[in-house]
């Protein structure tokens, strides 16, 4: 399953492989994971865009994101959904 492979690759810091594993997955969960990966890579602009896309698809992602350390900086900088 692409999502499980992507999560495992993200945990192992193999971000390129993680992105490939979910490249065709357009779900809210995949967008959220792409936001996490972008955050890990220091690309906060992409992290914000992917996070907003995830929340647009599934409002519950907003609550999850507010508790996620990966996005603390975005919220401190005024991110709103």
Where does each model-flagged region fall?
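Terminal, low-structured helical/coil segments at or just beyond the last alpha-helical repeat
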Residues: 56-81
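TPR/TPR-like (Sel1-like) alpha-helical repeat modules
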Residues: 26-28, 39-63
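Alpha-helical adaptor scaffolds
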Residues: 1-43
């Amino acid at each position: 399953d692409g999502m499980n492979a992507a999560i495992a690759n993200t945990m192992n810091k193999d971000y390129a492989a993680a992105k490939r594993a979910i490249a065709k997955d357009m779900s809210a969960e995949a967008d959220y994971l792409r936001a996490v990966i972008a955050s890990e890579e220091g690309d906060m602009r992409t992290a914000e865009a992917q996070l907003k896309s995830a929340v647009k698809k599934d409002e519950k992602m907003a609550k999850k994101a507010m508790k996620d350390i990966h996005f603390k900086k975005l919220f401190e900088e005024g991110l709103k959904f």
